Amino acid sequence: MSVQSAIKRKTAPDIRARKGGDPIVMLTSYHAHTASLVDRYCDVILVGDSLGNVMHGFETTVPVTLEMMILQGHAVMRGSQHALVVVDMPFGSYEASKEQAFHSAARILKETQCGAVKLEGGVRMAETIAFLTERGIPVMGHIGLTPQSINTLGSFRAQGREEGSWEPIEADARAVSDAGAFSVVVEAVAEPLGRKITETIAIPTIGIGASAACDGQVLVLEDMLGLSPRAPKFVKRYGELGPGIEAAIKGFAEEVRSRAFPGPEHVYGMKTKS
């Protein structure tokens, strides 16, 4: 048995069993190198469709394709060993029918070897979630602010902050849980609502701008590292890597232009005859 195969990777049932226990730690990653770093400290690595914003410069996640998700999902699997890897199902890959969702999700699992998929939507996607889980595909749900719905929402604004606006979101949470999802991301909702959902559904909630009471938390890696020029209110910057990277690039450019780089230690001399 190889060392790689002997290492136990976390599974969807492992995460499901964490309900009410130690907080679940989740970050995004899209590359093998960052995945190897995130893997040391996180329970779950999300290959998010936010790669459309972070890697490709799209304004929204809508243009992201299934092929993009599979390519980066495979890279993250190669770079990680311990964490459960969850790959987002992109817009247009699952909404048309349960069968479309199954074929897309099966491709993701087969071609990346990840442990689960994530899809957006509550009540409207409950039948699809049940269809997938009954066929051996673990599903993480996503309710509250659902970025793939930006064209109908109109803007990225927090949900459940108005009087009488909780019930549809609570219904979404119940539907996802009852359909068999192993966990659910709750994004950008009023804090009391995030707390209530966590207390009332059977599966772990993973908050992103929801509540400290959630069973876990997730952020986009580039946001928390200070690499994104703009970040939502719910992001805490744990680093400011942007200025450091810019300084390194500037230093390289200056040394190339002044011919200070490469120096003697960076080039190869002739071999001497023995």
Swiss-Prot record:
Enzyme class: transferase
Stored Pfam families: Pantoate_transf (PF02548)
GO cellular component: cytoplasm
Documented EC number(s): 2.1.2.11
Pathway: Cofactor biosynthesis; (R)-pantothenate biosynthesis; (R)-pantoate from 3-methyl-2-oxobutanoate: step 1/2
Predominant location: cytoplasm
Sequence intervals crossing the membrane: none
Protein localization: Cytoplasm
Catalytic reaction equation(s): 3-methyl-2-oxobutanoate + (6R)-5,10-methylene-5,6,7,8-tetrahydrofolate + H2O = 2-dehydropantoate + (6S)-5,6,7,8-tetrahydrofolate
Binding site for 3-methyl-2-oxobutanoate: 49-50, 88, 118
Cofactor binding comment, as recorded: Binds 1 Mg(2+) ion per subunit.
Active site: 187 (proton acceptor)
GO MF annotation list: 3-methyl-2-oxobutanoate hydroxymethyltransferase activity; magnesium ion binding
BP GO annotations: pantothenate biosynthetic process
SUPFAM superfamilies from the UniProt entry: Phosphoenolpyruvate/pyruvate domain
Cofactors, names only: Mg(2+)
Keywords noted in UniProt: Cytoplasm, Magnesium, Metal-binding, Pantothenate biosynthesis, Transferase
Residues that coordinate or bind Mg(2+): 49, 88, 120
Subunit structure comment from the entry: Homodecamer; pentamer of dimers.
Record's function text: Catalyzes the reversible reaction in which hydroxymethyl group from 5,10-methylenetetrahydrofolate is transferred onto alpha-ketoisovalerate to form ketopantoate.
Family recorded in the similarity comment: Belongs to the PanB family.
Stated name of the protein: 3-methyl-2-oxobutanoate hydroxymethyltransferase
